[in-house]
């Protein structure tokens, strides 16, 4: 098909047809406008065909070792010789338990350790709301001196004593609001949205109470400069960076908040502190995995869209600084860390179209975790579900798994 201009006309032809398909009679002004638009379009087509400038080596890559300028390839080469000194090797339960003690001690050191003395909780209820299927209480407590946690307690109706309880930890985004049914305007919503799909409410729908906490550097736990940007901007860069400067980590800080949340659960008569689980997605999955390692009061855990290898996720794809533990690859891979939860029940779910925690590495990592569980004689206590979806909460098998193992 061709377009041509005649005197006062626009002619559209098709080579397969004997004559013009269309002839439009136009004023000179219309033709001038159309000609200008056509010229602009031609420039855009030429620009689209022109390779985008990527740096000073454009046009010289055939003259240099191009791979030598790629930092990710460089780190992958370093990974090949990573020590992984405490990666799992045991073949019997006795050796496996000793391995757990050794690796837990090392990872605790890498995280920056945990406070030996816990300050009083000084908890305070801020608000109570009633909904058709549950009751929602907003509360705060002191985690560390000068560091406070906001949370929501969701208890199912009708009210009963000693509810099995899930600690729910969200990932990057708007913070805890996004898992308890609160929209970006602070209003209640009835449709489960976002990539986390209000999974704290879903836990309640499966018969458990949910204690959803605001992770440090998200939501209301951000500095004033970050809050001024938008609801989804995290304060991880200044806060997690500061942790590293102090020889600590954001993961360690968030894990300690989970420990303190369970301290708070123990003060509530309607919650059964002997039936506590922990679940989280993405960065909340990170927190859940590490918290389950160090907090024995967590009886079952669900890690959504996190379990992978360090190599194929945070070492290969751009991720937030809050994910990193200095020196951990000298000692272990991610599957080793997850194996420290054994033999307590662990459920893992992974999206087949997750671009930041690639599915093949998730599957391979889980197989390594399962082998650790098998050495403990607990192979049936860990499961993975892969689903046809992106980086998002699924819960189809995971929530029933948690309810079953917490005797709901």
Question: What name fits each language-model region?
Answer:
Residues 1-27:
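N-terminal secretory signal peptides
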Residues 76-155:
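Non-catalytic accessory segments flanking enzyme active sites
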Residues 147-148, 157-165:
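Proline/glycine-enriched tight loop/beta-turn segments at coil->beta junctions
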Residues 168-256, 313-315:
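Cap/lid segment of the alpha/beta-hydrolase catalytic domain
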Residues 238, 242-246, 260-261, 298-339, ...:
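Mobile cap/lid helix-loop segments that gate and shape the active-site cleft of serine hydrolases
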Residues 271-280:
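Alpha/beta-hydrolase fold nucleophile elbow
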Residues 367-368, 373-408:
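C-terminal catalytic histidine-bearing segment of alpha/beta-hydrolase fold enzymes
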């Amino acid at each position: 098909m061709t377009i041509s201009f005649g005197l006062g006309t626009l002619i559209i032809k098709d080579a397969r047809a004997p004559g013009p398909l269309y002839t439009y009679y136009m004023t000179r002004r219309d033709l001038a406008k159309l000609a200008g638009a056509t010229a602009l379009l031609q420039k855009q087509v030429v620009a689209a065909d022109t390779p985008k400038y990527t740096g000073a080596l454009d046009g010289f890559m055939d003259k240099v070792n191009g791979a030598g300028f790629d930092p990710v390839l460089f780190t992958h080469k370093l990974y090949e010789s990573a020590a992984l000194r405490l990666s799992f090797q045991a073949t019997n339960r006795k050796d496996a338990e000793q391995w757990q003690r050794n690796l837990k001690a090392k990872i605790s050191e890498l995280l920056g350790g945990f406070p030996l003395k816990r300050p009083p909780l000084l908890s305070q209820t801020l608000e109570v709301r009633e909904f058709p299927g549950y009751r929602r209480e907003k509360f705060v407590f002191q985690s560390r001196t000068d560091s406070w946690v906001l949370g929501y307690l969701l208890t199912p109706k009708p009210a009963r004593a000693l509810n099995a309880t899930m600690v729910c930890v969200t990932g990057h985004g708007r913070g805890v609001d996004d898992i308890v049914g609160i929209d970006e305007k602070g209003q209640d919503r009835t449709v489960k949205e976002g990539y986390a799909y209000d999974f704290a409410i879903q836990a309640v729908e499966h018969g458990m109470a949910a204690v959803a906490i605001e992770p440090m550097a998200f939501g209301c736990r951000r500095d004033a400069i970050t809050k001024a940007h938008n609801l989804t901007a995290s304060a991880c860069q200044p806060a997690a960076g500061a942790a590293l400067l102090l020889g600590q980590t954001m993961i360690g800080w968030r894990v300690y908040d989970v420990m303190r949340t369970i301290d708070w659960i123990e003060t509530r008569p309607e919650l059964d502190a002997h039936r506590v689980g922990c679940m989280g997605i993405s960065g909340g999955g990170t927190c859940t995995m590490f918290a389950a390692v160090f907090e024995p009061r967590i009886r079952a855990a669900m890690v959504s869209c996190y379990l992978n290898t360090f190599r194929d996720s945070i070492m290969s794809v751009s991720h937030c600084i809050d994910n990193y533990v200095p020196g951990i690859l000298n000692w272990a891979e991610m599957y080793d860390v997850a194996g420290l939860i054994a033999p307590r029940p662990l459920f893992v779910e992974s999206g087949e179209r997750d671009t930041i925690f690639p599915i093949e590495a998730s599957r391979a990592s889980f197989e390594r975790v399962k082998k650790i569980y098998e050495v403990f004689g607990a192979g049936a206590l860990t499961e993975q579900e892969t689903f046809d979806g992106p980086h998002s909460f699924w819960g189809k098998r995971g929530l029933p798994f948690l309810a079953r193992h917490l005797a709901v």
